[in-house]
Every structure is written in structure tokens, then in C-alpha cells.
Amino acid sequence: MKTTLALLACLCALALAAVEPIPAFTPNERVLFQGDSITDGNRGRSADPNHILGHGYAFIIAARHGAGFPERKLDFTNRGVSGNTVLDLEKRWAKDTLALKPDLLSVMIGVNDHSRNVPLEAYEATYDKLLTDARAQNPKLKLVLIEPFVRHPGKPVPEGIVARQAIVAKLALKHGAALVKLQKVFDDAAAKTADDYWVWDTVHPTYRGHQLLADEWERVVREYWK
């Protein structure tokens, strides 16, 4: 039993040692994840620390870097809300984003805007305003924008999603944000196995898919702020 515990401790230590620091994560920073259900990840709505970050990519990133670099005293917060469009996000932006005063803000929004036919013009204008307001509050704010994506086996990506991906890329360039492009990541992964291995309902990642998302997020953010 003691040998097994010692082995597990060694494996955990090796896993943490393999984590590379992200330059964008400076000591005492608050990292805020915003978005819809993919970000929400069934997060807790109370102070219970067991579930406060949810069970998705935000949790993976926070756990890896919170445990890997405790001396940095990073604060990871998740305010994703299942079902949100950018119009819903606008209604709670002051309370759930600006009031939290993040140092790094990551946003993933758009798939519900597509399914609910939010006009592209409204999607872009509202998203742009939210980012402008966040930057006005903190000129040094680091922004990460994650493009919406879907997986429809054997079908092309819907035009509405493609259009929103282009808008997110445009806004990332305008606001000096790191851009996390997921469509190709999941398309490439799906080419190696069944779609539902990564995304179980064309929209929501499985735990494996969340790991893919977290890995790509970290890769892009690490590269953007070297």
C-alpha cells in the first residue's frame, strides 16, 4: 500500500513538473472565463470549491496551473452560463465581468446565437461593445477569444457558424486578443475516431473534447504572450 501511494505521489509530481508556465499568467492575476454552456460546464453557483469552476476546459486550465504554480497565487473564475447568446451576455456583463475586474478575460460565445438566429450584425456589434467596455475599464486587459464551432458528421460547417467564426477573428484582431480556433482542432480529431468521442451532440464536448479545448487554449495563449 505504501509503495502504491509513493508511486502515485511520484506520478503526480512528474505531471505537475511537466506543466510549462504560461507567461500571460503573472502573479496574483484574476483569470475570468465567460461564455455559454461549454464554458459553464455545470459549474456551481455557491461558494462550494468542489464544483465552482465546473467540469470543462476552464477547470482543466485552472487545475493544471493552479496546482503547478501555487506561488503565483492565480485566481481562476468561471462565469459561463448555459444557453447564453451574446445578447444575454450583454445583460450581465457589468455584474459578471466588469465588477470582477479580470486581468485576463477569455470569452467563448456564438453557437447559441447561431441556433437562435441572432442577426450577424447584432452579434458583431454587441460583442464589439462588450470587449470595448472591458478594455476601457482595464487598458492592460489580456483578451482571449474562442471561436464557436460545431461538428455535423458528413456535413459542412453551417454558414452561420462560419460567419461568426470570421467575426470573432475580426474582433480578435481589432481588440488585440489571442484567437483560439477550434473548428480545425475538432475536425482533425474527428478524422481519427468517431465524432461523439470528442463532441457528443454536435455542440458540447465530452471530457476528452474539453481536454482538446484546454490544450489548444493553452498553446495559443502561451504563444501569443511569449
Where are these regions (language model features)?
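Alpha-helical cap/lid subdomain in secreted, periplasmic
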Residues: 22-27, 55, 59-75, 84, ...
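Short glycine-rich His-centered loop
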Residues: 23-51
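Positively charged n-region of N-terminal signal peptides that target proteins for export
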Residues: 1-4
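Bacterial N-terminal signal peptides
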Residues: 6-15
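A short, compositionally biased domain-edge/stem linker segment
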Residues: 14-24
